[in-house]
Amino acid sequence: MKVMPGWEDVLAIAARFPGVEEATSYGTPSLKVRGKFMCRLRTNPDALVVRVVDVADADALKLGEPDVFFSTPHYDGWPGVLVRMDVVSLEQLAELIEDAWRIQAAKRVIAAYDAGE
C-alpha cells in the first residue's frame, strides 16, 4: 500500500536547498526562497500548489499525467500546477520542489549548490 506524501516530506525535500524558508500563503503552509513562492499546501490538504517554469510547462504536466497534475479555473494561466498528493511519487515531488527552487533562487546560489559548495 502506497503511503501518501505529506507536508513533512515536502519540508524534508526542501531542506536540501539553500535559502528555502517556511512561510504562510493564503492561510496555508508554504515554502519560499528570497521571499518568492515555491509551493504551498492547498486549503484542501490532498493537493500541493507548485510553481513551474511557465504556463506551457504547467500545461504539459497536466496533459502528460492528468491523474497527478491538475488545475482549477483560479490557477489557469498561471505558471504552476496542483499536485494530487495521494498519487504523486516522492521522486516526482522531489523534482518539482527542486525545479521550483531553481526558478526562484538566485543564480549564484544555484551555481554554488551545483558546484557542491
Language model features with spans:
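Charge-dense, helix-prone N-terminal extensions
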Residues: M1-E117
